[in-house]
Design a protein with these regions (language model features):
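A short helix->loop->beta-strand "cap" motif at the edges of active sites that frequently abuts
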Residues: 23-25, 145-146
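Conserved class I S-adenosyl-L-methionine
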Residues: 32-47
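Class I S-adenosylmethionine-dependent transferase superfamily signal
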Residues: 17-18, 44, 138
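Conserved beta-strand signature within the Rossmann-like core of class I S-adenosyl-L-methionine
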Residues: 24-32
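Conserved SAM/SAH cofactor-binding pocket of Class I
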Residues: 107-178
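A short glycine-rich, Lys/Arg-flanked "PGG" loop and its adjoining helix->strand segment in the class I
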Residues: 11-23
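A short SAM/SAH-binding and catalytic strip from SAM-dependent methyltransferases
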Residues: 1-8
Length: 178
């Protein structure tokens, strides 16, 4: 997987690779220079303790062999925790770094919620659910909704979306069909 631009997500990915590769194994990453390759390489060096680098055609490849002696266990644990869902905004929602608009409500979603009809009912779908903001707001505004199907290309978004839906349902004291 190519390291993402979002720094906390990239650090968590480097930590996951460091934790899963066998001693003596090699971890490699490639990033475009205009996609954060310099900071990606610096973070890679921090977690692995060293790196070899090749830069060509506006890209950078960096790799390192692994050894227990080069890892800082505290840093490894800290960076692994960066991918965990965390409270955002006023604390009503949880999300995780790297998701679209992960720590805010994006303007398009805010516009949709502002114009959401209150008479929605039955089974509804949230296409591109992200961390579940629209689904939760639909539940708050539309008492007739009996089921919600979440569709999201980023699998990492489903855990916070489910947490947010469960929390909203608990606040509203109502169940959904499964």
């Amino acid at each position: 997987r190519v390291p993402p631009r979002q720094r906390d997500e990239a650090r968590a990915l480097f930590a996951r690779a460091a934790a899963h590769v066998a001693p003596g194994g090699i971890v490699a990453a490639a990033m475009a220079n205009d996609e954060g390759a310099r900071s990606g390489e610096a973070d890679f060096r921090k977690i692995f303790g060293h790196a070899q680098v090749m830069s060509k055609c506006h890209c950078r490849v960096f790799w390192a062999s692994t050894s227990a002696e080069t890892f800082d266990p505290a840093l490894l644990a800290d960076w692994q925790a960066l991918d965990a869902p965390r409270a955002i905004g006023d604390g009503r929602y949880v999300s995780r770094p790297g998701l679209f608009a992960w720590n805010r409500v994006d303007p398009a979603s805010a516009l949709l919620v502002a114009h959401l009809p209150t008479q929605l009912c039955g089974r509804v779908a949230d296409l591109g659910a992200g961390y579940g903001y629209l689904a939760c707001e639909a539940l708050r505004r539309c008492a007739g909704i009996t089921a919600i199907d979440l569709y999201e290309a980023e699998a990492r978004a489903l855990q916070p979306a489910r947490i947010n839906l469960d929390s909203t349902l608990q606040q509203l004291d109502r169940p959904l069909e499964t």
